[in-house]
Amino acid sequence: QIRHIHSSKIFNRQELDMQKLTDWAGNTSWGFVEGFPLTGDNCAKSMYLIQKYMVEKTRLGIPIFTVAESLHGAVHDGATIYPQNIALGSTFNPELARKKAQMISDDLHSMGFRQVLSPCIDVVRDLRWGRVEESYGEDPYLCGLFGIEEVSGYLENGISPMLKHYGPHGNPLSGLNLASVECGLRDLHEIYLKPFEMVVKNTGILAVMSTYNSWNHIPNSASHYLLTDILRDEWGFKGYVYSDWGAVAMLKDFQHTAKDDSEAAIQALTAGVDLEASSNCYWALEQLIEQGRFDEKYVDLAVGRILRVKFELGLFE
């Protein structure tokens, strides 16, 4: 449940390779899968076959979360594309975000997806940053209002949105993506975390994506303070945290707070990252537990959070 199947492992261009799926997944239940290379027409059939395999061929028969990227429309040929968030933010009309999410939900359902990696409510404070278009703007309150509307639009239509990118992100040093955001506690809470707090406290959001950069050179995806003390204990978030792609592996390959996969997995999971996306450090956890080097309770907590959301969204029905 705490691992993610990358589409590159099981697809041959536009075709799902059932042998690859069998070899990769085995009889193990997985948390999530995406189909980024697929056209919209091919998505529904492929997602159905993957779900059928997970329910009928794995030991526990737990449904998998089918995941799509959709900052301004599903990232699949044939889907409708809408203006980027920075354009919507410029209208100062948050209701547009709700309408956008409602219409995107129709596309997602038709393609077999239940989880969407959106909305992005990063507060942008450096125009040199290459991801400015993903956000609604520079004002925390405005970003929060748009986030509330977009999340509500998805939830009303049976799609689980994912709030991203949690942790200071939109003002990296020199405007460089992945660079650390430098600020004190006041700016952290009043600027960068404010829209996330607004959405968590005013919607039924069940998924949050942690960033792969750092705050004051401490990786956000290894920060117990951000992911547990603030998000869960202070704000009352009850869902799961999904790593930005490669964030766990970056702890060893980029930020160098971990020397290997085992240390990266321990740092991320104990901080509060429930699901590792696009890397395989969490594979080391089974051996760590068998050797008595890691407490299984952290895996139980993460699995429980993910299963709870799957039940709430009706995946078992």
Show where each model-derived region lies.
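Glycoside hydrolase catalytic-domain context in secreted enzymes
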Residues: 1-317
